[in-house]
Curated annotation (Swiss-Prot):
This is Protein let-756. Residues 277-298, 314-425 are annotated as: Disordered. The keyword Membrane applies. It comes from Caenorhabditis elegans. It is found in: Nucleus; Membrane. GO terms for biological process: fibroblast growth factor receptor signaling pathway; negative regulation of cell projection organization; nematode larval development; neurogenesis; positive regulation of cell population proliferation; positive regulation of MAPK cascade; regulation of axon extension involved in axon guidance; regulation of cell migration. Gene3D superfamilies: 2.80.10.50.
């Protein structure tokens, strides 16, 4: 996507150090870049390339050698709405100057123009054109700027192109393949540390704006309107945004209160205006009268409620007074009752005894044995052995002695004392 502008030739998207591509990286190349072969080759060749680039830059600055032709210049626009800038700041105490890496809203800042130095396949370094400093990332993930004499592997970043033509720049020295440390700029312009960066966050997406300054007679830094070229990426608005809306489609006028008021203000007929004012005054008076009626009715309801509560309170007090009078009358009647002087104290009368007096329970007899119950003899049964017949005597004294045999038993205890024991009945 190459769009000519009035003041410069600008190309949007694509890789920073490679030739401009009109389409994103194919899946084959994406897999090739992520393969172990390419990764191992980059890790083995990057230190050597870094040393060679440092010597080349020193020769350019000290001996005046011409710069390399493969370097592209441009600017990095963050999707959060800021331009990557390397601003020199002078310290008033000692007079030293340091370069601050941050994001700026100024589109025409000359400190936002950078050049991309190719280190290896998909490895680039970002250098400010005005400050001659490289953007680096320290072990804590903080961005800083360093001169060409201190150029190291911390100044090398892995460039990755996404499907939406935005680029990601991850630190080559720190982080890993699964948790890379990206360059991120907040909406306020403050950079975020590498360990806290995310791939899918807008603050880590950068749009490469290339400037072919050699072809321009009067180069203007960032002399273009980015909003006219990549509206969808910069505004992050749905298709209902005015820049996406078709100009040929016009909506019918929708009358509402504001349009009615505007028509009343623009009215030139004084008689009509006076009529509208009188009608408005009548509506205001009617509204005021209705409000007064409503307040009057509410006051009447409140007064009726107060009278009802007052009558209920008086009735409750009257009822309590009557109860108190009744209690006093009953108490006076009890005190006025005559006493019996013949027998002022009641005589003591013992409790009536029970008619059936039970005898005390005998002591427990551990040697007591239950009487042997003889099996009944049935005349109808014929056994092989003969049971001795019990002589049935008609003497009641003899029958009583036979029954007393089972009530008491004579048992010899360890003390050799024959005592009659009885078990609990």
């Amino acid at each position: 996507m190459a769009v000519p502008a009035a003041s410069s030739i600008v190309s949007y998207g694509g890789a920073a150090t490679s030739n401009f591509l009109t389409t994103p990286v194919t899946p084959f190349l994406a897999g090739f870049y992520n393969s172990n072969f390419v990764t191992d080759r980059i890790n083995s060749c990057a230190p050597y390339r870094v040393d060679r680039i440092r010597k080349q830059l020193q020769d350019e600055e000290e001996n005046g050698y011409p710069p390399a032709d493969d370097r592209r210049r441009g600017a990095l626009f963050c999707r959060s709405g800021t331009w990557l800038e390397m601003l020199p700041i002078e310290n008033p105490d000692d007079g030293s100057t340091r370069v601050k890496v941050h994001g700026t809203k100024e589109e025409s800042s000359k400190f936002s123009i950078v050049e991309f130095v190719s280190v290896a396949m998909s490895l680039v370094s970002i250098r400010g054109v005005e400050t001659k400093n490289f953007i680096c990332m320290d072990p804590s993930g903080k961005l800083y700027a360093t001169p060409s004499s201190n150029y190291s592997t911390e100044c090398v970043f892995l460039e990755e192109m996404m499907e939406n033509y935005y680029n990601l720049y991850a630190s080559c020295a720190y982080g890993d393949r699964f948790n890379p440390w990206y360059i991120e700029l907040r909406r306020s312009g403050k950079p975020r540390r590498g360990p806290n960066s995310k791939k899918r966050r807008k603050a880590s997406h950068f749009l490469v704006v290339h400037h072919d300054l050699d072809r321009l007679r009067s180069p203007v830094p960032n002399g273009n309107d980015v909003t006219d070229l990549v509206v969808a990426s910069l505004f992050h608005q749905p298709p209902s945004h005015p820049l996406f809306r078709q100009q040929t489609v016009t909506k019918p006028p929708n009358p509402h209160r504001i349009s009615n008021l505007r028509a009343k203000v623009e009215m030139t007929n004084q008689a009509e205006k006076q009529r509208l004012l009188e009608e408005k005054k009548r509506r205001r008076e009617k509204k005021k009268r209705r409000r007064e009626d409503r307040l009057r009715k509410e006051e009447q309801i409140r007064e009726a409620r107060r009278q009802e509560l007052k009558s209920l309170r008086e009735e409750e007090l009257r009822r309590r007074y009557q109860q108190q009078q009744q209690q006093q009358a009953s108490t006076q009647t009890r005190y006025n009752r005559p006493q019996n002087p013949a027998n002022p104290y009641p005589t003591y009368r013992p409790l009536p005894t029970r008619s059936t007096v039970q005898s005390p329970r005998p002591a427990y007899n551990p040697y007591w044995q239950s009487p042997v119950t003889q099996a009944p003899h049935h005349n109808s049964h014929h056994h092989h052995h003969h049971h001795p017949r019990v002589s049935s005597s008609s003497d009641p004294q003899q029958r009583h002695q036979s029954q007393q045999h089972y009530l008491a038993q004579t048992v010899s205890n360890p003390n050799r004392q024959n005592v009659n024991y009885q078990r609990y009945p």
